């Protein structure tokens, strides 16, 4: 009230009469209009209906290329004379706003926006979320449905509606609200901000959107006093009381929360250091302002601390919001399994046919691929050791065991050699008849060996027992993984690139027969590429594998059947190396694709499973120890502190190490969501490093958190397949036809002679300088010392 001037009611009436029904223009109009609306309500002057144009929001849509849209920025942009010292005087700001708007009108007219209705066309419906006022809120999942909806909200906020920061439309939040409790949030919440200018029913209407309203201890809002948003703590406390009273009048739950950002009170220094840094991607933390000299302590307060922080309230009211109501929220929440316990075996995706019209019977396809290739390499009547190897890899030991027992029981008078013959004949036929026949065989075995003391053998018990007995690739449910890998390799091969297998997948003969790996894990042997004859023993009946660790080191030999030169094969790798001794370990098939073809292989997964079923494996980048050390030093330099000891800097750096800094993606990891489930059953998704231009979306969780739930394909890029392709193109030589026992090639590991140079010319004792993995100082020294002459020795050196 100004002495000798009209009162508020009179001034409001005069202003409304003067303005009439004309449109009103203001900068940050929502704030200004709220005071007019409050006065009109207070003096029963009706409802405010004038059209309002906000130069702040208009600038955000008209000048999208600019980061700043405050009035001080606009007057500079539109060349309006301006004295910054006079800023925030009502008449001066109004004049400046009018002049800016006049310039804006000229720009709008030049772009053919001539009416107020035309302004609605400035922004498309798809981009409207970029320009609205945003508020913070909290969401608590009450149950599994709520958790799934929470994941969907996080996904949408980080992709569809991502603009500078994650955001979600209120309408979309309402659509996905089932199973969630929506809380009002912190000092950046709608209720905390709008309660400054709204009261009564208007404030109640805002509160009614939320399931519970939050207030934090005054200390948590302390920075708002430093920024002059509040005059003092007394005004801040009254604001908190206003929110509490309005919430109770609205019949909603009012809850005291901590807006926790660090655990102990003394940990505040770590947050101060982090806040002091630039935000990845540009900008500063909201608390990193020059007028905020002391950020609030947002530690995890005890109940006693919380009650003490709200001691300005009535004691019973403080207890209600700190203890009673927080427990009411807790009682609403069910125990939820966030990460599904699968027992370590991921959900397997279904695999579609090449034309995409049907789902493949993976066990049958895998079996057919394996036996077709095995027959072409080793003949229609497979050697017993190969037959047994395939059976054990596909199903574990149980199928061979059942076939042997049946052969023995049905033919008690036959000699062992004949029993073995019948066993393998039965084994071959049963596996080719399919998975159901295998389960039937095991079921019969269980019925025969079941004892009364084991209890009643009903169908459910038998199913569980069959599942327990089964192992291996098909028995363990890993056949889709093999089939997917086979299709990825074939896709790359069809595009003209080799694929190298990494790690222990080479110990799987099934993988070899499916074309996933070129490594043959059988013991050293000969096989004829013309007539499929194979030899595993020498002339004395001794296993070749007992003498030779690698088949590539076998002496040359001609086929005794057709006279063709025999191919030397076999690296003697037990299957347990890959799938475990019980054949129950989840296979991890790592493949090296050409770095020129890796992107194509990644895109092919979208063809195999669909765009919404494949995601890059997400990673979380944290503050490294050395980076944290730099943060601490920079913090003290900004504060003008120069006398800190190194040990103190290291202590503080340790507290900052491991803090999340950004997100990223695994270089080759593709996570596959089976099409009978949704990604929101497991994780939200986002763009890596919040980059909306990324071709891929990533899992929001670090992939390690869900690696036992979802299959991860390791489609890695490597230079070796690229180099081999280039060599093949330059020489016209088929890489796969190059003999691996060439004596001149082997000699370069002990001499430079075969290369036609001297060791002085290349300054190296051997010719390995340009060989991948063998040209480093360490391996050069190892090769010079060990002088390998066989392929097996090279394998051992590579292993070191």
Where are these regions (language model features)?
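Conserved non-catalytic scaffold segment of RNase H-like nuclease domains
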Residues: 1-49, 64-78, 84, 88
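Short glycine-rich phosphate-binding loop at a beta-alpha junction
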Residues: 23-29, 255, 498-500
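Short alpha-helix plus adjacent loop in nuclease-associated cores
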Residues: 41, 52-73, 137-140, 266-278, ...
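Conserved beta-strand -> loop -> alpha-helix junction used to position metal-binding or nucleic-acid-contacting
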Residues: 46-60, 118, 182
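Acidic, divalent-metal-coordinating active-site segment for phosphoryl/phosphodiester hydrolysis
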Residues: 89-102
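Mg2+-dependent phosphoryl-transfer active-site scaffold
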Residues: 106-376, 405, 418, 488, ...
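Helix-hairpin-helix/helix-loop-helix acidic hairpins
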Residues: 212-239, 372-499, 646-651, 657-660
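Catalytic DNA-binding helix-loop module of base-excision-repair DNA glycosylases/AP lyases
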Residues: 491-493, 504-516
